[in-house]
């Protein structure tokens, strides 16, 4: 015991020496889950290992809506918390209040260069949002409880489960009911992150490998996520095992890259999620290090900008899986470092949102005399470079520093502007303007900035702007024009700057076109006795934004979209759509400098483009939508009103799936409307010399406008022999004068596939394929069947079967008939996708136990789930690579195709049993270090294995009777 303790203390003391900077943009990082391991060590022991870069502590496994009496979420961190929970008005909550080891170890991990995230979700269907507002409130609570400590939170004595420890981000391992709330929640987190600008926080997500992932596809498409570690295990057809086997159209990392590129953050890093041992996932999904290396090499080389590394489920499994004397995680680290010798990269961590870049430098020199009349001529040249990747964010910063001189003849000022769009090449542009003028004079610089996004090479030109000023008989003229031929978004600017400037900035977007106009006035002071000028400019930028519709089709591209999502409170669960444009959000902000010779006015404009996917749809028609916004010019604030009007959007996408699409329902829906948005989100002013101006955006949205019509009609069929005759020799139990007796009988069963029928209903999805989420793979049905035709079940009292009269249930054959026709289809309980389930499952008592064909206990779909039929989804259905159980436009559930079987288990009376949450009603710390029942992103197949055990128990009871 003492040597072990000494080793642990030594490991902790060595954390500082092992510290290395975390690099979010690296392609050889390892992320791991912690909190659900069997007899897991302390967090600090894993942080003492050099292999891990990100550690997700899981889970927050229920939300306030599931705990209405306390209004607090629930948690489960395994054996790392005491049994105490927070109490609200005398009622104990599900949120553990004392987790001292984690509270002590998080700062140590961070000192060692690790990032620690708090993970939400897990493998139990005990969490969901009923409203969007609930997701906002939960984000605020988690930020207060696990984010930076604030005085307001402390004074209110609100929960801090990890004490003063602060997590580095939040992870979403959402496996049930994920269609509502999560995109909004991530956006809310992003806003709260802005409250601590000197610290970087991250968002990660762990979807299943099927595309679209039914739980997180909406969030990935609409909210900025930094890391996506796909669970490439426990789901047949898209797992890493399919890569090893060479399955055609199997391992789908390439498709996930496309999902990332079409999402809200095309610069997100994509990790390969793998089980850390054979026991961490279903049988067959574990990959040896020798199998992992070629996979990592191929995709690290193919997508060096997107590949982020490997995610492992989970830390304790990795440590226990010793290979050549080291843990599995160390083997994976060796592979990553071998293939990426430059790790860690020399660059600094990027900001979470993408920022492409161009640079414009403008230098102005002015020569002044005391002449009463002057003429100012300004010319400017512009070089424009276009970037190929989609621009996600454009940030423009302009700084002007006029420098007065005591000399009567010269004054100079310089302007440097940096525009930062990012995916890649840094296009640069420069312009130099020189002018000679006589004092007093007034000149007007013109800044014209025209980002354009077009389908075909076109050019847009800003009309010349001219101004004249009759001060002292002087006049000035400035003109600018911009020509931007490009196929992809590009930014160009023409800039003419003078010493005493009225700053005019015009920004034109080819989708919704807007102009951004700012003005500032500088007044030179002259001395009447000395022919010299002392320049003391006073600058007051005023920003106004005037909407303009696209001028012509040749110089701008029209926004065309069939589905749009524009605000936090409006999310679309449609995972696949065709869009030929982007939705643009912009947040202009400006700073108002003090009037002094060293004034540095700075104007920042952020333009975020959210591209939408344009694949997986074979036919479709959309109509143009026009987005316009008007912004009044004010000196103290910025208000933006946006209106989205959609005339009519009709979309008829069609898709097909290579695996059964189970619902056989026909439904159509049509909705037409318009979205009026008044953005309401606090802006972040950017200032270099102090500013009291705040850009405010206020948003109120109805549902995005889209009109769609379609029907889903999928009719699974099977091909079987015309008639199957089965002769079964079986036995049943009856009563004779001396007690129970067993009678052997013969049953001849004739099965005709043409007359077979099947039905399926849906309820709590607790027996999904482990780790694959609700809906992304079929639930494990409760198998039932009719008793043979003519057989009857009776209840009687037997006086000779035991010491006392005993009530027994008997299933007896008919007296004269031995033939019956059996149903080829069992009835299964499959999940509902509305997120409103009660979270309970049924436990059944088995009466008749003829076994069905197939293996229902190995964590894979029940018999017939993969019978090889190919179904085609009607227009309007989503593409999926896995069976879709139940669901549809009307919520009806239809039959699941199964192969024929002679008998099925017959459940009798049911009793409702609550679904275990997390590792049970209390953490494993109160159970002597026992393993949690469910393991989040890991395997859930142990639950499925309980079905055969139940059958065996029932048989043994019958035998005793």
Curated annotation (Swiss-Prot):
Positions with biased composition (Pro residues): 342-355
InterPro entries: Cts1-like, Glyco_hydro18_cat, Glyco_hydro_18_chit_AS, Glycoside_hydrolase_SF, Glycosyl_Hydrlase18_Chitinase
SUPFAM superfamilies referenced in this protein's UniProt entry, alphabetically: (Trans)glycosidases
Lipidated residues (GPI-anchor amidated glycine): 936
Modification(s) after translation: O-glycosylated but not N-glycosylated.
Active site positions, chain numbering: 175 (proton donor)
Effects seen without this gene: Decreases the frequency of germination.
Signal peptide residue numbers: 1-21
Compositional bias of kind Low complexity: 356-510, 519-544, 552-604, 612-635, 666-720
Region (Disordered): 338-720, 767-787, 813-842, 912-933
The keyword Repressor belongs to this UniProt entry's keyword annotation: no
Keywords: Carbohydrate metabolism, Cell membrane, Cell wall, Chitin degradation, Chitin-binding, Glycoprotein, Glycosidase, GPI-anchor, Hydrolase, Lipoprotein, Membrane, Polysaccharide degradation, Secreted, Signal
One Gene Ontology molecular-function label: chitin binding
An individual GO BP term: chitin catabolic process
Catalytic activities: Random endo-hydrolysis of N-acetyl-beta-D-glucosaminide (1->4)-beta-linkages in chitin and chitodextrins
Regions of compositional bias (Polar residues) in chain numbering: 636-665
Known EC number: 3.2.1.14
Domain GH18: 28-339
PROSITE patterns: GH18_1, GH18_2
CC terms in the record's Gene Ontology section: cell tip; extracellular region; plasma membrane; side of membrane
UniProt topology in membrane: Lipid-anchor; GPI-anchor
Subcellular location: Cell membrane; Secreted, Cell wall; Cell tip
Family named by the database record: Belongs to the glycosyl hydrolase 18 family. Chitinase class III subfamily.
Xref: PANTHER family: ENDOCHITINASE (PTHR45708), ENDOCHITINASE A (PTHR45708:SF47)
Role played: GPI-anchored chitinase involved in the degradation of chitin, a component of the cell walls of fungi and exoskeletal elements of some animals (including worms and arthropods). Required to reshape the cell wall at the sites where cell wall remodeling and/or cell wall maturation actively take place such as sites of conidia formation.
Name of the featured protein: Endochitinase A
UniProt source species: Emericella nidulans (Aspergillus nidulans)
